[in-house]
Amino acid sequence: MKRVYNFSAGPAVLPEEVLREAADEMLDYKGCGMSVMEMSHRSKAFAEIIETAEQDLRDLMGIPDNYKVLFLQGGASQQFAMIPMNLMKNKVADYIVTGQWAKKAAAEASKYGKVNKIASSEDKTFSYIPDCSDLPVDEDADYVYICENNTIYGTKFKELPNTKGKTLVADVSSCFLSEPVDVTKYGLIYGGVQKNIGPAGVVIAIIREDLITEDVLPGTPTMLTYKTHADAGSLYNTPPAYGIYICGKVFKWLKKMGGLEVMKERNEKKAKLLYDYLDQSKLFKGTVEKKDRSLMNVPFVTGSDELDAKFVKEAKEAGLENLKGHRTVGGMRCLLYTSPEPTRQEAISY
């Protein structure tokens, strides 16, 4: 069996140990005579799967009891609408725009109320994180929104913005479980799992209980109300059962590896290997201000579209897949998500 070096932005690489365990259980999950793909989401077996997954996630992140963990569907993009539908009580929200995903989230939220773009890095092609220590936060804002790690541009908030007491909402899709996090600093953390945690099709939302109410915008669909899913334990309708099962296995793998402190150290090691190479290279260069570099996403260029294309082509021939940059920016992009071993970065550095 041949496994390539896969640098995909998502769906991304999963721990081989998890994939092998899932393969062993594919036809018969723990003696029940069926696959997790086939079992009822109301069964005792699946109840154990989803409850264990939630508890392991709580253990990893130190999630307090006054936060709900929701396993949802619809992708992170669906949250762009679900958040204002549920949280825009005053119909005002502040957005910090540091990339395409925050920009899209702000555009979607503007359909439901007033959106203030209180900081942005679009003036320099989202190559940095703006100073967020003294933001012009609207006194009527229901929340302040960020995309904490920018998959396309390779930037990361190293310090959370000063929201001046307003609820912080964060899309953490591409940095989920890559390092320790203080959940209490957020009102809502959410992300698609297909980058650091599991297969596509699952969104995890961690939301403070006081934000889960029946007081949502008029016309909000039942399925887009956080209370619907919180009250039903993420089982209001058939959940993405197999995806949750794989997420649960990844949570156990992360705990076995030593938790998020160990993951942060490992991710720093992987990123340093690649950034050090780029900084001394006469051919390649990074595109992000050093102080704001992401540990997860590393874009780089040669300065020539022709050379970029040649590199991507020859890298693929050498077994290094999915290094082409995002379609909106070009160049190359190396994804350093949590699961892969540092040997992948050694491969690209050579």
Features from the language model and the residues they span:
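PLP-dependent aminotransferase-like
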Residues: 77-142
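Conserved PLP-binding catalytic core of the aspartate aminotransferase-like
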Residues: 284-315
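Conserved active-site segment immediately N-terminal to the catalytic lysine
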Residues: 169, 183-194, 203
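Conserved small/polar residues in nucleotide/adenosyl-binding loops
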Residues: 337-343
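Conserved N-terminal alpha-helix of the aminotransferase class I/II PLP-enzyme fold
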Residues: 32-79, 86, 100, 108
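Active-site C-terminal subdomain of aminotransferase-like
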Residues: 15, 193-275, 289
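Active-site phosphate-binding strand-loop segment of PLP-dependent enzymes
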Residues: 10, 109, 121-176
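A glycine-/small-polar-enriched, mobile loop at the entrance of the PLP active site in fold-type I
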Residues: 3-54
